């Protein structure tokens, strides 16, 4: 099957995101509000995670094993990442839009965050871990990177208790569209 990568990127640039349903049918979705991970002083994390960061047990990499991160994100009891969506992520990666932000412990992939970068927007698609704290360390290090690279926002799409612990907050669609427009005007590089 052929995919129009430009049209897919345009869908994300308009504020939509792809998800597969329980029958693996892929559709575009929107939301009345989005969840942002703060890139300012509102970002926080548990003190216990600071101890892990101080121990420097993990190293960070970008796109060292993109396909393993996609597979890790898809490998759960209920997933919205169908085999078709995995192919699309691979094509977005090859086109310079999809990235994996990874933590490693030696030669073992500890965790990662799968995201799409368009301008100054980082759109987090999913995250996973294989080693405890692996994805949490990835979150902290990714926020540091996005700050350094002057990204406008980190869109985590949907709120959950895990993200709340990092200071995640909701943005109504009108506000999201304004910030998205600002992000699209900025040329940011994750790498």
From Swiss-Prot:
One of its GO terms (molecular function) is leucyl-tRNA--protein transferase activity. Gene3D superfamilies: Leucyl/phenylalanyl-tRNA-protein transferase, C-terminal domain (3.40.630.70). The keyword Cytoplasm applies. InterPro entries: Acyl_CoA_acyltransferase (IPR016181), Leu/Phe-tRNA_Trfase (IPR004616), Leu/Phe-tRNA_Trfase_C (IPR042203). One of its GO terms (cellular component) is cytoplasm. Its main location: cytoplasm. It comes from the Bacteria. The keyword Acyltransferase applies. It is an enzyme of class 2 (transferase). Pfam families: Leu_Phe_trans (PF03588). One of its GO terms (biological process) is protein catabolic process. Keywords: Acyltransferase, Cytoplasm, Transferase. Its EC number is 2.3.2.6. It catalyses: N-terminal L-lysyl-[protein] + L-leucyl-tRNA(Leu) = N-terminal L-leucyl-L-lysyl-[protein] + tRNA(Leu) + H(+); N-terminal L-arginyl-[protein] + L-leucyl-tRNA(Leu) = N-terminal L-leucyl-L-arginyl-[protein] + tRNA(Leu) + H(+); L-phenylalanyl-tRNA(Phe) + an N-terminal L-alpha-aminoacyl-[protein] = an N-terminal L-phenylalanyl-L-alpha-aminoacyl-[protein] + tRNA(Phe). SUPFAM superfamilies: Acyl-CoA N-acyltransferases (Nat) (SSF55729). It is found in: Cytoplasm. Belongs to the L/F-transferase family. NCBIfam families: aat (TIGR00667). HAMAP family: Leu_Phe_trans. Functions in the N-end rule pathway of protein degradation where it conjugates Leu, Phe and, less efficiently, Met from aminoacyl-tRNAs to the N-termini of proteins containing an N-terminal arginine or lysine. This is Leucyl/phenylalanyl-tRNA--protein transferase. It comes from Nostoc punctiforme (strain ATCC 29133 / PCC 73102). The lineage of its organism: Bacteria, Bacillati, Cyanobacteriota, Cyanophyceae, Nostocales.
